[in-house]
Amino acid sequence: MKKNKLKILDCTLRDGGYYNNWDFPRELIEEYLQAMSAAKIEYVELGFRFFKKDIYLGPCAYTTSSFVETLNIPKKLKIGIMINAKDILSNKLSKSKIKKVFFNFPKKNKISFVRFACHINEISKIIPICNELNKQKITTAINLMQISEISDSEIERISKLAANSKLDIFY
């Protein structure tokens, strides 16, 4: 991991999707992207990448590469998605199915970063996935959840593991 200056990530659509099932009107998404660009926000997390659900969820619940490709994204914005580590680690699907759903990025790809939400016991399994994504020129981040429930020694141990990986961001 490299030490860099402070970066701002906006996750309004991803986080706000809990209120409307990630079903934002296209016009709102594009106006939002223009506003983020005008505000000089560099990183925008458009939504999650979930497996298909039995209930209706809007496009920002799946944030497929094909959906992102249809958006008018200002040049300086870096677009990303969030993936819950449990969705890929606890799923009984084959590795090829998981790769197809979660990591099927075209060569010319508008998604430039993936942020994983992880519990401490998931991090060592997600780091190799981050390393693979880095080979595709995708910036990777791990968000350590429920950190207040973790001992200082465990935080130190997992931080060293992250620091010795190709992971770009760990917090």
Regions inferred by a protein language model and the residue ranges of each:
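Short glycine-rich loop/turn motifs that provide flexible caps or phosphate-binding loops at active sites
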Residues: 15-16, 46
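Conserved, mostly hydrophobic/aromatic
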Residues: 16, 36, 114
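Active-site beta->alpha loop and helix N-cap motifs at the rims of alpha/beta catalytic domains
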Residues: 43, 48-161
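Ligand/cofactor pocket segment of small-molecule handling proteins
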Residues: 167-171
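A short, Lys/Arg-enriched amphipathic alpha-helix followed by its capping loop at the start of a domain
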Residues: 32-41
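N-terminal amphipathic alpha-helix/helix-capping segment at the start of soluble metabolic enzymes
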Residues: 1-15, 22
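Conserved functional loop/turn residues at catalytic and ligand-binding sites
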Residues: 40, 110, 166
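Anaerobic metallocofactor- and corrinoid-dependent redox/one-carbon enzyme cores
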Residues: 26-30
